[in-house]
Design a protein with these regions (language model features):
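Residues at the start of alpha-helices and the adjacent loop-to-helix junctions
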Residues: 7, 19-21, 60, 105, ...
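N-terminal signal peptide c-region/cleavage motif recognized by signal peptidases
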Residues: 4, 9-11
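Acidic/histidine-rich helix-loop elements
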Residues: 31, 56-65, 93-97, 172
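Flexible, glycine-rich phosphate/dinucleotide-binding loops
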Residues: 28, 64, 129
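Alpha-helical cap/lid subdomain in secreted, periplasmic
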Residues: 69-196
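Serine-esterase "nucleophile elbow" of acetyl-processing enzymes
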Residues: 12-61, 71-80
């Protein structure tokens, strides 16, 4: 009886630490096979590098920071992550939602993850220049929250992709499968130091 209990407990002891990817359609792999989305490629990279981490992708297409803030507690309880990648905000910007609300939501999510002893990476976004001053304030909000909450920061998820129309699906919003390795490389720059 005791041996059976020990055998059952062992996998929990050796389980990989978890990375929770908490984003919108840009991380959910909208319009492409799931295995091609950057969080799936992240899982493969971790395996190749023999890093003891698993990946839980809790991204939902269309999600705003308000929606993310509402569902983060349950996602944290379920995933028990060592690292949380917050990749939300693009839909707030595209809808022209108040920047203060987005900042407050990002800060609350970072704080909630930190209270669960998770390291946090905030992934920034940019808007097209035709959004005017709002676009500048929007982009600056990500860095401001990262500084305030002392999290890691990736400046722009679509860095190197946004200016290349051939790397977008027909809607001109969502990256193709071919763009996903570039998204992963961008995220990796901020994520890798958190895995040590």
């Amino acid at each position: 009886m005791v041996l059976a209990g020990l055998a059952f407990a062992a996998p929990t002891t050796w389980a990989a630490r978890n990375i929770l990817v908490f984003g919108d359609s840009l991380s959910a792999g909208y319009g492409i096979p799931q295995e091609a989305a950057w969080p799936s490629l992240l899982a493969k990279r971790l395996e190749q590098k023999r890093l003891d981490y698993s990946v839980t992708n809790a991204s939902i297409s269309g999600e705003t920071t308000s929606g993310g803030r509402t569902r983060l507690a349950a996602a944290l309880d379920k995933a028990q992550p060592a690292v949380v990648v917050i990749a939300l905000g693009a839909n707030d910007g595209l809808r022209g939602l108040p920047i203060k609300t987005m900042r407050d939501n990002l800060a609350a999510m970072a704080e909630a993850a930190q209270k669960k002893n998770a390291r946090v990476l905030i992934v920034g976004q940019r808007l097209p220049p035709n959004y005017g001053p709002y676009a500048t304030q929007f982009h600056e909000a990500f860095a401001a929250v990262a500084k305030e909450k002392k999290t890691a920061l990736v400046d722009f998820l679509l860095d190197g992709v946004a200016t290349r129309p051939e790397l977008f699906q027909a809607d001109n919003l969502h990256p193709t499968a071919e763009a996903q390795p570039m998204l992963l490389d961008t995220v990796w720059q901020g994520l890798a130091p958190l895995l040590k």
